[in-house]
Structure formats: structure tokens, C-alpha cells
Amino acid sequence: MANHDICPRSGKGYTIPILIDCLKRGLNVGADFSLLIGTAGIGSNPDPLTSGLYFDLDMLDRHDFFIEHDASLSRADASTGNNYSFNQTIWDTVLAYYNGMANATIPVASKARYNRVTTEASRDPDFSYSPVQFILSYGETALYLSTMGDPITGVAPLEYVRSLFEEERLPYELGWQPPKTTTTLASLGAMGLELNAASGEQVPEGIILGENSLRAVLIGLNAATGEIENDKLHALANLTGALGGVTSTLTSTLNGLTGS
């Protein structure tokens, strides 16, 4: 969105208020999710307590820090030495699943995503895929289906999706407009569940995929136990207000584990 001057074009000095505003205006993403990913973004700042509660886009490139991870839909794994440039060969393996379809859908997007996981797991000896990456990977696929299409049905015109990935632009010239329905943490969690059901991928032990698990990893909690797993991120979540709802997250997680 920096390419469209919706977010700061410099890629510098992203604060939570800036992110909430530009994600709402640019993609109709709700403040609940923007607050969480903004907090996670600030976690990429080497010293946010001294320099300020902000992040620059180039800080997000660190391997296995939320944005950058193995089994990307359009980038090679970190072990190749170039995990930041668009990779047409990899992206073509995703497009192959659509086989002439006009729209991206939950069932097909799910299978294309899972193929990337199994492909890299089989050929990359340094492949990294923790429960955190498992949860965030489903969230990412839900996010592009929601913002390029419909946050409820998950149907998105494939030409919009291709423009987003291949040109790194919002496809206004193709007729796209931000969806009328707001994308929220709850809608992303619900779509993540549908994506997982469509793929047949086994959920890591103790994880209950959905809104609460997505919130948990973005505020530094272990999604299976509810315990603090990332001290820095959890402390930042306290400062930014992202811990709001943490009590319900812990309660829901633990109730799910105990069956109560």
C-alpha cells in the first residue's frame, strides 16, 4: 500500500495509529487485527523502548519473524540465500492449482498453500515450520482471500490475487475496491479453520486453530498452553494495548484443552 501512498511511501516510521488508518482505508481491515500485527511489527525493531514504538518495513525481513518464513507462496526458503525476491517458479506452482479458474477459493487456496509446505519440507534440510508458522501461514492465506475478495466466502478474483503477488500493487486498474465487509481477527480465524479443514493438514498437538490462536501468537503467547513464549513481544503488547482480550484468549484456549 506504500506504492499507492495509502501507507508511508518511505517504508519508515510505521506506528500503530498509522497502520490502523492505512489498513482500514486501503483494505478495510479492522483495528483489532491491525493492532495485533502492528505490535508484532514493532517487535522487529531492535530497541523499540529506546527508539520508539514503531517499525520500518525493512525490519520485517528477519527469518521466522512473522512476515518472513519458509514455504512462502511466492518466495524461496531462507536456506537458498534469497528469501526476499519474488520467485515466479514458486508462484507458478501455486497458480497451477487454479488451472484456468477465474477465482481463488478456500478449497483450492488451501491445497496450494499446503503443497508449498510439503514441497519445502521434503527438499529443504533447514526447513522451519513451528506451530507459530503453522498458525500465521493460514492467517496469511485468509488475509489475501479476504482483502482481494470476500472476508466471508473467501472467493477472490484470481486476477486481483495475481496483481497483488506479482506486481505488489492493489489492483485498482482491474476494478478492485476494498471489500465492503471488514476483515477482522474473528473472520480471519474462522477462514483459517475452513482452510485447514480443506487441506487435511494435521493441527499441531494442543493447538485449537482460530481467532484465539492467531491472537495468542501475535502477543507472544504459546497458542497451546497460553504461557508467555516471547517476552519482548508480550511486553510490547502490554504497552500498545494489544493485551486487551488476553484473558478471554487464555480462558478459551485452556477450556478447549480441558474440554470444559
Spans of features found by a protein language model:
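Polar/charged low-complexity regulatory segments
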Residues: 1-2, 7-260
